[in-house]
Amino acid sequence: MTIIDGFNRFESKAPPRWLDTITHVFFPERCLFCREVLSSSEGRPICRSCSNGFSPVGLICPACENIIIGKSSCLCQSSFSYLQSLFALSYYVGQWRFLLHNLKYYKRRSLARPLGRWLGLEIITRQFCQPDVIVSIPLHIFREKERGFNQSSLIASYTARTIGKRHLPLLNKTIDTISQTTLSRRERFENIRNVFSSNKILPQGTEVMLIDDIYSTGSTMKEAAKVLSSSGAKVHGAVIAYNPLIK
């Protein structure tokens, strides 16, 4: 039995399926963008009208952070040893920025379900990777108590449920850092250095999908991936939104 098989304390914050079902009966799911009631046949949490023309950002090169077209490798032919691949659902603009801002700062936890499920559906459709386990970027315990929840953990819980994998707490954030929001690219990497830890040793080659809400410079995800890699994992990243403006 591996450590993953024997891990009893799941991090998943998603409510039980029966509660989701009852909630959907009395409060039908609505389009994330226009709020139209969705039919039960809808896959993505947006209506057909809003989904016209939408295409996920897709694969991003972890080394040069350019978009990878098709399934070929990036033209830069570089590699980032800790992060094997990276998938983004959208760009951090417009309505996507509004949704994530409301989830994170205005505590609209209900947004985590459709966002996490949508990410999971796209991962399945595009056969992004076949992870053994889902892990989310952790908050420091003081920051999570202050906010009341971890938005990345909530999103990851629903993504894990959608793709049928477990969401496990394999990472801890041991230092309560200042916000990355106003920092430059260089400052972000310095701010997040050596702030994550893990006391779990994984079977060599365990495929881990590391989930966060936003990828900007990649400083947070790459630092977390470094820790998971040192524990024996092969790490793939997946995010709701990609913000390529900070270089």
Protein language model features and the residues they cover:
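Glycine-rich phosphate/pyrophosphate-handling loop used in enzymes and phosphotransfer proteins
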Residues: 1-247
